[in-house]
Amino acid sequence: MNAGILKAQGLCKSYKDKEVLHNLDLTIEPGKIYGLIGRNGAGKTTLLGILTAQNTKNSGEVTYDGQPVWENQKALNDICFSRELQATLFSGPNNLKVKHYLKSAAIYYSRWDQDYAGRLLEEFKLEKKKKISQLSKGQMSMVTILIALASKAPITILDEPAA
């Protein structure tokens, strides 16, 4: 049975001549906590992006509930990939106010808990009318953690949550 299991088999990824993932096998089960440790440039963020259908792979297979993650609505609803916001980007999401960024995140997660998001916003003392680009690095981390928690996704992946 593959219920709620995110699985990679034979995963390979290269950038030009640099192979960052070689024949990687990985199984992630809901309700468990995993850690991924490696040096800068080792392929951690690349792997997380591939597992969540946000980056392409060269070869191998990634499945959720036994089905490929690409173009899989169940995987999109059930897996939250919350990645580090970049303070240097002043376009895209960083140009949004916190309240609009959270509203857009709610669209992607069918289990989104708006009340919980509001409570976390207050508890983290985040100003909802501030643009993402105006937040400190620590506040940006709080926004990514808030989204991960409020998504209520069975599988939540945090990339550098406290960077």
Give the predicted meaning of each segment.
Residues 6, 21-23:
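Conserved structural motif at the start of ABC-family nucleotide-binding domains
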Residues 34-39:
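The feature captures the beta-strand-to-loop junction immediately N-terminal to the Walker
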Residues 74-77, 83-143:
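ABC-family P-loop ATPase nucleotide-binding domains
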Residues 52-53, 60-71:
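Conserved ABC transporter NBD signature motif
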Residues 156-160:
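Catalytic Walker B motif of ABC-type/P-loop ATPase nucleotide-binding domains
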